């Protein structure tokens, strides 16, 4: 697998020294004369490999080390320890050939110039990456069509909606046709329709150009829609690297059964068929063990006045919350 890896991290570690300062004038003087530090272990011994064309989700709570890892893989931070190769280059050397092959999109940062049309930023990026005029027009046309931005690129960025600005940010970041995309919360703050549009674009871009993508997101719908494989990081340590289905099977040994009944029933009448999570009128939601699911569904159909029944995976948010609540179980 490592021979095929486009992104390779080996024992990647980043520690920060954070200065400690007491309040008050005396504390300021002590801080100036006898400065003390606290060591923050942001990332500790992270290793993984990503093959060409993979879309991998990178999950973790705030402060887990996701963004720090991305910054090391894009060369913005030098690691305290460890090695990395991205598209055949050591990231923190920041070689010109390396920068042409990668891009980093952060949902809380922007490169578009606020008071100018997005097209001006695109032309600036084209000059930086030495994209010929003919190729520039072709790429802008392709990406604008994929993103639904036709007619929007000549408006000042400040007049675009949040969703349109994020799409324009993606267009600017992908103008040089990078091989490896690092997407850090690309749907942050977007409404549901804009989130779906960005997800569909990422899927289409990966299919059309075979790009390798490492995606962080707090919106589990992004991960479920785009990623078959996930990395889970917590307190700077990698807890899980594998299939999303494997994570679900390990931390959600149950399926969700949604029922529409012919008449309302009390919660007590449903307890014999599974763990009752919700009852509202004629609708109910039960958790049923994966083992023996078929038999349990047959009992439900036989013992309850069912008008409609749907079996689903539990919400990914619930599964991830369980992972972070019991990290030792993941490591074990």
Regions found by a protein language model. Name each.
Residues 12, 24-32, 103, 123, ...:
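Conserved ABC ATPase "signature" region
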Residues 255-326:
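Short, charged/small-residue-rich alpha-helical element at the C-terminal edge
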Residues 199-287:
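ABC transporter nucleotide-binding domain
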């Amino acid at each position: 697998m490592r021979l095929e890896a486009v992104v390779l991290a080996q024992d990647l570690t980043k520690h920060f020294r954070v200065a400690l300062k007491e309040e008050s004038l005396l504390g300021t003087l002590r801080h100036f004369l006898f400065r003390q530090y606290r060591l923050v272990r942001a990332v500790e011994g992270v290793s993984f490999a990503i093959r060409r064309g993979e879309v991998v989700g990178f999950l973790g709570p705030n402060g887990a080390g996701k963004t720090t890892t991305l910054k090391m893989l894009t060369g913005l931070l030098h690691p305290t320890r460890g090695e990395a190769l991205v598209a055949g280059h050591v990231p923190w050397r920041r070689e010109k050939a390396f920068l042409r092959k990668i891009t980093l999109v952060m949902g809380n940062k922007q490169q578009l110039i606020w008071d100018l049309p997005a097209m001006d930023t695109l032309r600036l990026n084209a000059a930086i990456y030495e994209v010929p005029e003919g190729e520039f027009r072709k790429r802008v046309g392709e990406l604008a069509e994929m993103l639904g931005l036709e007619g929007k690129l000549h408006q000042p960025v400040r007049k675009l909606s949040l969703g349109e600005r994020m799409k324009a940010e993606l267009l600017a970041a992908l103008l040089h046709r990078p091989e490896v995309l690092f997407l850090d919360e690309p749907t942050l703050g977007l409404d549901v329709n804009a989130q779906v549009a960005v997800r569909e674009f990422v899927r289409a871009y990966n299919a059309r150009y075979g790009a390798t993508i490492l995606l962080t997101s707090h919106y589990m719908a992004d991960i479920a829609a785009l990623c078959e494989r996930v990395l889970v990081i917590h307190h700077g340590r990698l807890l899980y690297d594998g299939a999303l289905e494997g994570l679900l099977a390990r931390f959600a040994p149950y399926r969700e059964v949604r029922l529409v009944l012919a008449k309302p029933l009390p919660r007590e009448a449903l307890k014999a068929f599974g763990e009752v999570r919700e009852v509202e009128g004629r609708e109910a939601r039960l958790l049923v063990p994966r083992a023996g699911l078929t038999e349990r569904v047959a009992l439900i159909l036989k013992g309850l006045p069912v008008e409609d029944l749907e079996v689903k995976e539990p919400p990914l948010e619930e599964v991830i919350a369980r992972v972070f609540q019991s990290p030792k179980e993941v490591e074990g």
